[in-house]
Amino acid sequence: MEGRITQVMGPVVDVDFDSYLPAINEALDVNYDIEGHPKKLVLEVAAHIGDSRVRTIAMDMTEGLTRGTKVVARGKSIEVPVGEQVLGRIFNVVGDVIDGGDELKEPVKWSIHRTAPTFENQSTKTEMFETGIKVVDLLAPYSKGGKVGLFGGAGVGKTVVIMELIHNVAFKHSGYSVFAGVGERTREGNDLYHEMKESGVLDKVALCYGQMNEPPGARNRIAFTGLTMAEYFRDEKGLDVLMFIDNIFRYAQSGAEMSALLGRIPSAVGYQPTLASEMGKLQERITSTKKGSITSVQAVYVPADDLTDPAPASVFAHLDATTVLNRKIAEKGIYPAVDPLDSTSRILDPQVVGEDHYKTATGVQQVLQKYKDLQDIIAILGMDELSEEDKRVVERARRIEKFLSQPFFVAEVFTGSPGKYVTLQETLEGFKGILEGKYDQIPENAFYMVGGIDEVLEKAERLKANA
């Protein structure tokens, strides 16, 4: 099952086999030397181009490759380690450990190309997934086995929200998480690893990185590497796993690069003609089965803030909820900087979350929307010109805004205030009370950076004593 390289075009390599034709997605190994240093390269078959020749995508840089170099077919696709051993470690696309630690001891390996669960194995019941983050649980709740898009620019706190979710899943649901860095900056990946180490969540998460400087094959397939690790925990261990993909746009982008190099005719805006089916192939595997679930949070970069761009548009079709981070909210010092009016969820429906939750959430949104509408009047004429009714709305909206902030466990190191996990019951009680006017006499400051409503009352007492 040996072949020879006949052509190298950047990350695309053509290989000629004499008596064997490897299947699509089969892995091929190349061992060669660069200036006396041995190098191992993995290729993946992407197309058959006639006469027992195949066109492949390289999973690493191809410098130093020459025509005539020997290639060995594996007879199977890329396989990566799965199971408890992968927790706390960093892997590359082909499943090699890249954190400088010891190699894994005889790990179980699974192929990264797997079929999505069949209809009969999928679970159809919609359950809410409690995150312990007030603004998310109240206004844009996540569903178990659902897909969430996390939208935000640079520096508004996407990574901190991701780390807090990993923390809460690890400690409250005693579950595991998998993080796939797709086209990540190496620095960000490095920071994330060290921050997780410091905040004590590293031993509950597996990290897979395909960085920005790597060829498109590695950046594309890394999403499957991470997903395969998550699928093992779901299917073999029956767990509810959290899967993070940062950034899903880079998955589509790397597919576009590969498509052009493989000689396919580009589609709208230069993207690959197979964009929708490639996205579907990945997203359909992220689902709940009767054994367990994979809930995914996907950071979405929106090129030039254009939501109609084919790449983000292809993601929208798959999302159940969107969490939008807003710089203006971050500037007010309200963290997490989730936009309560822009974030949406498919399960914010009385039939799923119940009448009580639905009424409270819509009540909060109405008050915040009214406050937003009144802001121009306040800016020009001041608060005194408002009617008594409007003044009351503004005061309650400001309390709600402050109460939507929350101290995070993973930010304790920086803020000095202990993190808080707020149950859905506490969240609903607090916001219902504010809407009903129970806490109109309590100063606004008491609502800022606390957990449940009991803490607001304690903080108000402290403020009173210090006054």
Curated annotation (Swiss-Prot):
It comes from the Bacteria. It is found in: Cell inner membrane. Produces ATP from ADP in the presence of a proton gradient across the membrane. The catalytic sites are hosted primarily by the beta subunits. HAMAP family: ATP_synth_beta_bact. InterPro entries: AAA+_ATPase, ATP-synt_VA_C, ATP_synth_F1_bsu, ATPase_a/bsu_AS, ATPase_alpha/beta_chains, ATPase_F1/V1/A1_a/bsu_N, ATPase_F1/V1/A1_a/bsu_N_sf, ATPase_F1/V1/A1_a/bsu_nucl-bd. Belongs to the ATPase alpha/beta chains family. This is ATP synthase subunit beta. It is a peripheral membrane protein. It is an enzyme of class 7 (translocase). Keywords: ATP synthesis, ATP-binding, Cell inner membrane, Cell membrane, CF(1), Hydrogen ion transport, Ion transport, Membrane, Nucleotide-binding, Translocase, Transport. Its EC number is 7.1.2.2. It holds the Pfam family ATP-synt_ab_N. GO terms for cellular component: plasma membrane; proton-transporting ATP synthase complex. F-type ATPases have 2 components, CF(1) - the catalytic core - and CF(0) - the membrane proton channel. CF(1) has five subunits: alpha(3), beta(3), gamma(1), delta(1), epsilon(1). CF(0) has three main subunits: a(1), b(2) and c(9-12). The alpha and beta chains form an alternating ring which encloses part of the gamma chain. CF(1) is attached to CF(0) by a central stalk formed by the gamma and epsilon chains, while a peripheral stalk is formed by the delta and b chains. It catalyses: ATP + H2O + 4 H(+)(in) = ADP + phosphate + 5 H(+)(out).
